[in-house]
């Protein structure tokens, strides 16, 4: 007897797709689908166009793995940035968050996963850019502490200074859930790893 819902396949498919977005529940997905499908179809078309453009143009920077629309991102190609510091982060979105603080003027390296790290390319970059310090900007967890130790061990022959952001960042919390003042203080109070 559920024929009404069965007759709305396209709408329910949209709800289902929106619900797959992280942090979007069924109710929020339903509200978005209703808004886009009925109340503001122009916005839906605009979003569709923006998604097509993003999918067509977004890529990973060949140097740091951050998001870019060219082979090398704006940060890596900016000659005014400090070459002596390399900030390692876990996700491309972390670069956005740290850049918004305007506290760091060095370079970045995004670790998508430890399995994907090309240590040969990273070592070449350390030499070419004359990196002296690696800053680990990871949320504090035991797994991330192990990751820092592993990276330090792999790169110890470079005699780098290894630091990590201070423990003002709550354990188990992602950067997007931390206010900018706390994150800025933690970043500026980083300690030797």
UniProtKB/Swiss-Prot annotation:
PROSITE patterns: RECR (PS01300), TOPRIM (PS50880)
Zinc-finger found in the keyword field: yes
Keywords: DNA damage, DNA recombination, DNA repair, Metal-binding, Zinc, Zinc-finger
Magnesium in keyword set: no
GO biological process, one term: DNA repair
GO molecular function per UniProt: DNA binding; zinc ion binding
Protein name (Swiss-Prot/TrEMBL): Recombination protein RecR
């Amino acid at each position: 007897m559920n024929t009404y819902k069965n007759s709305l396949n396209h709408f329910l498919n949209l709800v289902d797709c929106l619900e797959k977005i992280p942090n979007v529940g069924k109710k929020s997905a339903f509200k978005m689908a209703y808004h886009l499908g009925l109340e503001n179809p122009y916005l839906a078309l605009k979003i569709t166009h923006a998604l097509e453009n993003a999918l067509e143009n977004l890529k990973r920077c060949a140097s740091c793995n951050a998001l870019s629309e060219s082979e090398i991102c704006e940060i890596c190609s900016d000659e005014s940035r400090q070459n002596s510091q390399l900030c390692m982060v876990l996700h491309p979105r972390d670069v956005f968050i740290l850049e918004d603080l305007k506290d760091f003027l060095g370079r970045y390296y995004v670790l998508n996963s430890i399995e994907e790290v090309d240590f040969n390319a990273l070592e070449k970059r350390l030499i070419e850019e004359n990196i002296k310090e690696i800053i680990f900007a990871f949320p504090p967890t035991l797994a991330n502490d192990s990751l820092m130790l592993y990276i330090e061990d792999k790169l110890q022959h470079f005699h780098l200074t290894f630091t990590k952001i201070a423990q003002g960042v709550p354990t188990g919390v992602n950067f997007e859930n931390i206010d900018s003042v706390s994150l800025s203080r933690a970043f500026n109070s980083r300690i030797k790893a």
